[in-house]
């Protein structure tokens, strides 16, 4: 199990990854987290090197993964992604995503 706090908009947000996360993700979103993470990592690498933005689908995957990991760390957070995201100002996906990918050992530092 990996626990880590990531700063988002000046607030330390706990995240947790463990063998339970894929089950939580599948139950909530009816999707395979490993396929989504692989797609997200590929998209992140390509977009970053090309200086381009993420597509909406990629952003949704990022939000879903971040939410599930945050919920796994603290199940008192809001019950919807929208409510959870509303507590933050705008933030850069490029600052948060690498830390989440590293937590799942999808990307290497």
Language-model-detected regions and their locations in the chain:
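Charged interaction scaffolds used for protein-protein
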Residues: 1-12, 31-52, 60, 72-109
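Short linear motifs in exposed loops
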Residues: 16-18
């Amino acid at each position: 199990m990996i626990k880590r706090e990531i700063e988002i908009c000046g607030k330390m947000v706990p995240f947790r990854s463990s063998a339970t996360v894929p089950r939580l993700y599948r139950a909530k979103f009816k999707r395979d987290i490993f396929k989504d993470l692989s797609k997200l990592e590929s998209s992140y690498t390509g977009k970053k090197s090309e200086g381009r933005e993420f597509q909406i689908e990629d952003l949704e995957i990022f939000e879903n993964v971040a939410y599930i990991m945050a919920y796994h760390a603290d199940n008192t957070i809001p019950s919807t992604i929208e409510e959870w995201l509303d507590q933050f100002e705008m933030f850069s996906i490029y600052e948060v995503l690498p830390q989440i990918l590293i937590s799942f050992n999808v990307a290497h530092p």
